[in-house]
Design a protein with these regions (language model features):
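N-terminal, positively charged nucleic-acid-binding surface of large information/translation enzymes
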Residues: 1-234, 275-288, 292-311, 343, ...
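Glycine- and acidic
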Residues: 1-4, 43-51, 109-113, 138-145, ...
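Conserved short loop/turn motifs at secondary-structure junctions
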Residues: 6, 81-84, 112-117, 141-152, ...
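Active-site-adjacent bridging/hinge elements
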Residues: 34-42, 64, 100-103, 128-135, ...
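Structured ligand/cofactor/substrate-binding pocket environments in proteins
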Residues: 54-66, 73, 82-83, 151-154, ...
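Secondary-structure transition/capping motifs at alpha-helix termini
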Residues: 67-75, 96-109, 129, 133-138, ...
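Short Cys/His-rich metal-coordination motifs, predominantly Zn2+-binding knuckles/fingers
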Residues: 181, 251, 372, 443-445, ...
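Feature 926 captures the class I aminoacyl-tRNA synthetase adenylation module centered on the KMSKS loop
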Residues: 201, 417-477, 481, 526-569, ...
């Protein structure tokens, strides 16, 4: 048998254990026709990222599920991998180049990509090694990257299929533009922040009547791109202006007044300015009225100038403009200013010209980039889009039919809201790091060719000069294919794809249901004909101890690796799930980490005690039932119940409840009670009693370690290996299940009567400050004496009884006796010689006053007809029970006071 160190030191165990798992190949999974598959694909963290608490909770939950299923006999596959993270990675590389005095353009696309791949190689393994420190039992032989050869093949296959089906198109549409990242982003990537702003009330003169039309805007810098003013055709205030024009202030340009339902008669003056190039609603108005689209912002957030206009004019002159191609304005004196600089200058000029009537402060939601938090500029830009309506419909139906369920169920609504309100997905990004769009343009005739590999000639004109689209695909485009691209798709003959797909459970945060979950669902259905998983298990975010979101600005982030270095990975893992509820945010608590570490130490010490009491020739195995005493059957029944309950909890993704159950069983049942109960038997001199106690101790410990293993894998492996008869690894051992043969309900109930009585006696002695060495006789009044008679050795050891008398009804003198009561027994214990009478009377009188106060409070509630009639029946019953218990408590206190004279 292996000898354990006196103290548990995770730093001496965890790395060694993990390497042994890797060397043993225990994480690797292959198709096995004799086993049922269970598959999880890891939400791929950014390749340049570092482990944070979100990763820690996400991967701990996945590891718990995988380890459990592996022990339950499944071919449990957990596919790991990382995401290329276009925007984030490109920003990191650009920042590093800037420090060298370089830009992307200076080194060119190929040179930049060489640097990006070098960056990925240098930093890409960092988060993988950190996930290993956490204990993640992924199949690292199958590690994937969203830009590896297989994923790239899948991306090109999907793009070409969708294009051929008419579901991918390129056009000038309104997009969300980030001037800092210098790329478009999708609707789902826009975060909204409440900010202070203003409504600037402007005056536009009507050419035909000379009157002033008042309108309000939060973005006066866009007015240079106004191509109309809208009124509602039903608004009687402006009926006389139908067909008229306004003169655009500052530019002195005539633009039409159009009648459109977008102008709300009930809001403000009912007049709105229309800037089709820089507002999504205005863009739609522009399409309805065939208005010019005039862009006044550059893509890096400045006002357009002469050079910008010349480039656009040349495009139009060459006939290369496409539908909804924006014209570009030379903004003159404002050209080159940032949008905020232009706002100040334009407002000053409007005020000077008498066109600024009023400034109205307001709070409003401003769209920001989810990556850099810069303000998003709506822009009409030529981009690639996916038509969402045909793809969203089956994805909605799949969830409605129950093919995919969300846990907790309430997140189904989040998913449905997103899917039912989704717009066409802008998938092109003006970045170099990522999957370059597989589309080429003929330099001779302008034909667009979409193909999985570079075409040699133009199919339209035969030209040989073709240029690939410089844009890359949205990162989420490749991530959407993750559940099946990692298993061999588009090779539908892939053995892994046939066996492990569809996957089973997706574990992820609620913040990316729109970004990622929804896209995986419609992608799986569209390209494989199957839902990619059957369950989406949602977890919340980890907040700090004050309930605040962890952020760099607050400086309240917690580094999981620092926690692991201090307390061990097991303690961090257990803290993250113990008592947690699916879908709810959780608070990081160092106190809870310390408690988890203490739990590990408690288990370590308990195992050392058991091992020290085993003879060298000990062979594990439960003795026959006739050799088991009441306490053995009690602990085996408790173990049985915990195994059944935990299995049910984990089947329903209630990891917090499962963790709490095994914690309570090991700490309260096994360590605090059963080990203590076993000690007298181990030292009794009765060989059979000692052997039975040892066998039950080892059997229960073995099962408890297996139940705890998914939560605390390192310490359970180390302790399991120390047990006699252990196998190569705990992680491939059978998961304990409910066993009807080990369910002794009568013995459990009987022994708990004894336990309750012992607890009551010990509590009383503690309150009276009676030293354990001071023992006394006792009389036990009970209608069922058998459990107590069978447990006299425990009464002597733990209730400090010298001798015990049993009676159904005690009618003797109670002078000098203290009474303790439980639901099954009442004890009469002579304590006068063991206590300080005056101190005890003072304590009892204090307890009496407290009990009288409780009794009065519950009585007042029950005497209130309105409470009894209107409160929930369960609450009223609960108050009645508390009232009855308070009555019994007060009666016992009064009897004890009387006994003390």
């Amino acid at each position: 048998m292996k000898e354990l160190a006196k103290q548990y030191d995770p730093s001496q165990v965890e790395d060694r254990i993990y390497q042994a798992w890797l060397d043993g190949g225990y994480f690797h999974t292959k198709a096995d026709p004799d086993k049922k598959p269970y598959t999880i694909v890891m939400p791929p963290p950014n390749v340049t990222g570092q482990l944070h608490m979100g990763h820690a909770v996400d991967n701990t939950m996945q590891d718990i599920l995988i380890r459990t299923k592996r022990m339950q006999g499944y071919a449990a596959l957990w596919v790991p991998g990382t995401d290329h993270a276009s925007i984030a990675t490109e920003a990191k590389v650009v920042e590093a180049m800037r420090a060298e005095g370089l830009t992307k353009e200076m080194v060119g696309r190929d040179g930049f990509l060489d640097r990006a791949w070098a960056w990925k190689t240098k930093f890409g393994n960092r988060i993988v090694s950190q996930l290993k420190k956490l204990g993640s039992s992924c199949d690292w032989d199958r590690e994937r990257f969203t830009m590896d050869e297989g994923c790239s093949e899948a991306v090109k296959e999907v793009f070409v299929r969708l294009y051929d089906q008419g579901l991918i198109y390129r056009g000038n549409r309104m997009v969300n533009w980030c001037p800092h990242c210098n790329t478009s982003i999708s609707d789902a990537e826009v975060e909204y922040e409440e900010k202070d702003g203003n409504f600037w009330h402007l005056l536009y003169p009507v050419k035909e009547t000379g009157e002033m039309l008042e309108l309000a805007t939060t973005r006066p810098e866009t007015m240079l791109g106004d191509t109309a003013v809208a009124i509602n055709g039903e608004d009687p205030r402006y009926a006389h202006l139908h067909g008229c024009h306004v003169v655009l202030p500052l530019l002195n340009k005539e633009i039409p007044i159009v009648c459109d339902e977008h102008a709300d008669m009930t809001k403000g003056t009912g007049v709105v300015k229309i800037t089709p190039a820089h507002d999504p609603n205005d863009f739609e108005v522009g399409l309805r009225h065939d208005l010019p689209i005039v862009r006044v912002f550059t893509y890096d957030g400045h006002m357009t100038g002469a050079a910008d206009k010349a480039a656009a004019d040349a495009l139009f002159a060459a006939g290369k403009n496409t539908v909804n191609e924006p014209q570009v304005l030379d903004c003159g004196k404002y050209a080159g200013m940032t949008t905020l600089e232009a706002r100040k200058a334009i407002l000053a000029d409007l005020k000077e010209g008498g066109f600024l009537k009023e400034i109205e402060p307001l709070k409003h939601e401003v769209g920001t980039c989810y990556r850099c938090h810069s303000t998003i500029e709506p822009m009409v830009s030529k981009q690639w889009f996916v038509k969402m309506e045909p793809l969203a419909k089956p994805a909605i139906e799949s969830v409605e039919k129950g093919e995919i369920k969300f846990v907790p169920e309430r997140f189904t609504k989040n998913y449905m809201n997103w899917m039912k309100n989704t717009r066409d997905w802008c998938i092109s990004r003006q970045l170099w790091w990522g999957h370059q769009i597989p589309a080429w343009y003929c330099d001779d005739c302008g034909e667009t060719v979409v193909a999985k590999s570079a075409p040699c000639t133009c199919p339209k004109c035969g030209g040989t000069k073709l240029t690939q689209d410089p844009d890359t695909l949205d990162t989420w485009f490749s991530s959407a294919l993750w559940p099946f691209s990692t298993l061999g798709w588009p090779n539908e003959d892939s053995a892994d794809l046939k066996y492990f797909y569809p996957t089973n459970t997706l574990v992820t945060g609620y913040d990316i249901i729109g970004f990622w979950v929804s896209r995986m669902i419609f992608s799986g259905l569209a390209y494989t004909g199957k839902a990619p998983f059957d369950t989406v298990c949602i977890h919340g975010i980890v907040r700090d101890s004050q309930g605040r979101k962890m952020s760099k600005s607050l400086g309240n982030g917690i580094d999981p690796l620092e926690v692991i270095a201090k307390y061990g990975a097991d303690a961090l893992r257990f803290m993250l799930v113990d008592g947690s509820t699916p879908g709810n945010d959780m608070r990081y608590s160092e106190t809870k980490v310390e408690a988890a570490r203490n739990f590990a130490n408690k288990l370590w010490n308990a195992t050392r005690f058991v091992l020290m009491n085993l003879p060298e020739d000990f062979e594990p195995g439960l003795p026959s039932e006739d050799k088991l005493d009441m306490s053995d059957k009690w602990v085996l029944t408790k173990l049985n119940q915990v195994a059944g309950a935990m299995t049910d909890n984990l089947d329903h993704y209630e990891m917090g409840l499962a963790a709490a159950k095994i914690n309570s069983f090991i700490w309260d049942v096994y360590c605090d009670w059963f080990i203590e109960i076993a000690k007298p038997r181990l030292n009794s001199g009765d060989a059979q009693q000692a052997d039975t106690a040892r066998r039950v101790l080892v059997y229960v410990l073995d099962k408890a370690l297996k139940l705890l293993h998914p939560f605390m894998p390192f310490i359970t492996e180390e302790l399991y290996q120390a047990l006699p008869g252990s196998a190569e690894t705990i992680m491939t051992q059978a998961w304990p299940t409910f066993d009807a043969a080990h369910n002794w309900a009568a013995e459990e109930e009987a022994f708990e009567k004894v336990m309750d009585y012992i607890k009551a006696v010990r509590t009383m002695r503690t309150e009276m400050n009676v030293h354990p060495a001071k023992k006394t006789s006792m009389i036990i009044e009970t209608a069922d004496a058998a459990p107590f008679q069978n447990a006299q050795v425990y009464l002597a050891k733990f209730a400090f009884a010298t001798d015990v008398t049993f009676t159904e009804k005690y009618e003797g003198s109670t002078d000098g006796m203290v009474q303790v009561s439980t639901h099954a027994a009442r004890g009469f214990i002579p304590m006068m010689e063991l206590i300080d009478r005056e101190k005890e009377l003072a304590r009892l009188n204090k307890e009496k006053a407290k009990a009288e106060k409780e009794l009065a409070m519950f009585g007042n509630q029950l005497n209130n007809p309105k409470f009894v009639e209107r409160a929930p029946a369960a609450l009223v019953e609960d108050i009645r029970n508390k009232f009855a218990k308070s009555q019994d408590k007060l009666a016992n206190i009064e009897q004890s006071i009387q006994a003390l004279g």
